[in-house]
Amino acid sequence: MPNIPTIPLASWIDKLVDGLTQFEGFFNVITNIIGGIVDAFQWVFDLVPPWLFIILLVFGTFWVNRKGKKWGLIIFEVVGLLLIWNLDFWRDMTQTLTLVLTSSLIALVIGVPLGIWMAKSNIVESIFKPVLDFMQTMPAFVYLIPAVAFFGIGMVPGVVASVIFAMPPTVRMTNLGIRQVSTELVEAADSFGSTPWQKLWKVQLPMAKSTMMAGINQSIMLALSMVVIASMIGAMGLGTRVYFAVGRNDAGGGFVAGIAIVIVAIILDRLTQAFNKKAKSE
């Protein structure tokens, strides 16, 4: 705009990031915690041979979905995972699962309590709603910049960026699920002298479980959508295969890695949906 000074917003943000990087000890603690979770998941995946992993997944699917249509999913799991194994993508797939599961676990641990807090206070909800809107609408690439500044490169900054991008659905659906619990049920719990914690654990959370699971499903899918972006800052996995294929203009390699990501996405999505149906039936 002519004759109007430019607001130095970018400079302010740079100074804020530079100031936060001075808290190196704090970020080292977070790095060690997240790194420990990542190493634990990867150790388990490396310990289990591919054939045993497939068998365990089939049994898990059968148990979760024993009352529903399960054979189509089981056949897809077996064929899809055998294809990934045959293409020599197994290690990449387990690294991708490590990133997704770690991000989803952290998003769940932070998001559910935050959603409960929002459900209990309209003021808190009014404060965090625009924050969640900001987190979901900001391009995911932008999160890589502060993640690298605070945590360096590797799996940890990839997990942090994925958590920020994937957490809002869990928070929103937890808040929504608790608020949708029938007031008659809440009043009945009050009439029996339930404490706020008893009311939360025995009435509100069980009734909101289905809605919360829908949010968790969305968070898992969003975390999986970050695998290619996270590969740009050193997070290993199938996303790295896609990223390298783009750099080499390798259409075949990129599509094959993309198909592997799609297989993982479908399996995770169908499993969480089956778990949600099982929770509803109970």
From Swiss-Prot:
GO biological process, one term: response to osmotic stress
Sequence ranges assigned to domain ABC transmembrane type-1 in this UniProt record: 93-272
Lipid bilayer topology: Multi-pass membrane protein
Cell compartments where the protein resides: Cell membrane
UniProt cross-references to PROSITE patterns, sorted A to Z: ABC_TM1 (PS50928)
An example Gene Ontology CC term for this record: ATP-binding cassette (ABC) transporter complex
Ribonucleoprotein keyword on record: no
Summary of subunit composition and partner proteins: The complex is composed of two ATP-binding proteins (GbuA), two transmembrane proteins (GbuB) and a solute-binding protein (GbuC).
Role this protein plays: Part of the ABC transporter complex GbuABC involved in glycine betaine uptake. Responsible for the translocation of the substrate across the membrane. Involved, with BetL and OpuC, in osmoprotection and cryoprotection of Listeria. Can also uptake carnitine when carnitine is abundant in the growth medium.
Name assigned to this protein: Glycine betaine/carnitine transport permease protein GbuB
Lineage: Bacteria, Bacillati, Bacillota, Bacilli, Bacillales
Gene name of this polypeptide: gbuB
